[in-house]
A protein has these predicted regions:
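Conserved phosphate-handling catalytic cores of large alpha/beta enzymes
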Residues: 375, 383
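Primarily the HKD phosphodiesterase
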Residues: 10, 14, 56-59, 74, ...
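N-terminal non-catalytic structural scaffold regions of very large proteins
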Residues: 1-309, 324-326
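A generic structural motif
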Residues: 212-226, 313-314, 340-344, 367-373
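Active-site PLP attachment segment
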Residues: 379
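Conserved small/polar residues in nucleotide/adenosyl-binding loops
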Residues: 387-396
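Generic beta-strand/beta-sheet core signal
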Residues: 37, 86, 101, 155, ...
Length: 396
């Protein structure tokens, strides 16, 4: 971690310089404006404050730190507001933490462009959610004076310590490990802005049990990776042209949907298996479409009455995986289906556990990989019976 820190600090500085000097000005040239709260005009400020009351305030939970309330748990990669409030009657200072609810709300809140008051107004105006919260802290701490607010972000160790050889039930062991990870691994990075007072920094370091080498002082906004959400804006001129991919010519007449739609005649259709029996096919993804090659192969295997069984390894799968849907359909069609599901896919463990259970409930025989190793490879084996053609069973 110390070696990483040495390389990371200059990169973080460069990142903030690029954000201030290049990205924000370039976005503004294309009428995309990211405003700080203090830059808002009266109409924009009123709109933001109203939005806070209606949409943000109800999901906030401020947590104070005092002898009766220990330092709250801070989840991995969460963005937080550290508030220092003062009781005007006693003069007592108190620290409180407010978590920025990014799972419920977008990191950047769009402000109606007609409120800009400019003749050539930006088309897209937004403000960071944490700024909306920070400048409305008085609503969370009525009767208190807000001495200051500061943002901070925590990164926790996400490694799962699993001893495969000692686990009677790998899935159960993994679920227990995931619960421990959610409860929080050791803090390996604390990010704070350079304007945060030293006493607040020390309070955070003590409360989070952070060493000096795990403290990163950032000269700018935290969590700049959330800027990725701006790519959803309808600005086609700023987007690289997407590559559509193609269907290999050799499989052009092997698409079941074309047969179903009448785009090709039954005597023109060639199943993928009949094509592969004659020649090997080398695919280049993403230039060759996955949907009309591998996905079509699995779908035809699931529905072909000559297919006896399917065996496949699964590492990372989407939440609406068509491959898994095809495997389930194959099992329901009476085929012998076996899936090796690698449960230990980093940050996809929950997803893989749910899919493994769903596959088992559908009649698929599921195994969980090789003890002590992680299975990354993507392999599928399909056994097809050709007894009606007096040919031996083939494996594809």
């Amino acid at each position: 971690l110390l070696a990483i820190r040495e390389r990371l600090i200059p990169l973080l500085r460069e990142q903030q310089v690029h954000y201030r000097q290049h990205l924000r000005p370039k976005l503004l040239e294309h009428k995309v404006e990211l405003l700080d709260y203090k830059q808002l005009n009266d109409d924009q400020r009123q709109w933001v404050d109203d939005t806070f009351q209606t949409s943000v305030f109800p999901v906030l939970t401020p947590l104070a730190v005092d002898p009766a309330h220990p330092f709250p748990f801070v989840s991995n990669l969460s963005l937080n507001v550290a508030a220092v409030v003062v009781d005007p009657e006693t003069g007592q200072r108190q620290f409180a933490r407010v978590k920025v609810p990014q799972k419920n709300l977008p990191r950047f809140i769009a402000i109606p462009s007609n409120l800009s008051g400019q003749e050539h107004k930006p088309v897209h105006t937004a403000i960071a959610l944490e700024q909306v919260i920070a400048f409305n802290l008085k609503e969370l701490f009525p009767g208190m004076t807000i001495e200051g607010h500061y943002f901070f972000r925590v990164t926790r160790d996400a490694d799962l310590e699993l001893r495969d050889l000692e686990a009677d039930d790998l899935m159960l062991a993994l679920e227990q490990g995931l619960r421990k990870r959610r409860m929080g691994g050791e803090v390996v990075r604390l990010e704070v802005p350079n304007e945060m007072p030293q006493d607040v920094v020390e309070m955070l370091m003590t409360g989070l049990n952070v060493e000096e080498e795990d403290l990163y002082v950032i000269d700018g906004p935290l969590g700049l990776d959330d800027l990725l959400s701006l790519t959803a804006l309808p600005l086609p001129k700023l987007k690289a042209q997407s590559h559509g991919g193609q269907t290999p010519t050799v499989l052009a007449r092997s698409q079941q949907h074309l047969l179903d739609e009448g785009a090709i005649k039954p005597d023109e259709f060639r199943s993928i298996f009949s094509v592969i029996r004659r020649q090997d096919i080398l695919l280049h993804h993403p230039y060759d479409l996955f949907s009309t090659t591998v996905e079509e192969f699995i779908n035809q295997a699931a529905d072909d009455p000559q297919v006896m069984g399917i065996k496949m390894t699964l590492y990372r799968t989407s939440k609406d995986s068509p491959i898994i849907a095809a495997l389930i359909r194959a099992a329901e069609n009476g085929k012998q289906v076996m899936a090796l599901v690698e449960l230990k896919a980093r940050f996809d463990e929950d997803n893989n556990i749910q899919w493994a259970r769903h596959l088992e409930q559908s009649g698929v025989h599921v195994v969980y990989g090789v003890l002590g190793l992680k299975t990354h490879t993507k392999i599928v084996l399909v056994a097809v019976s050709y007894t009606h053609l007096t040919l031996p069973t083939r494996r594809f």
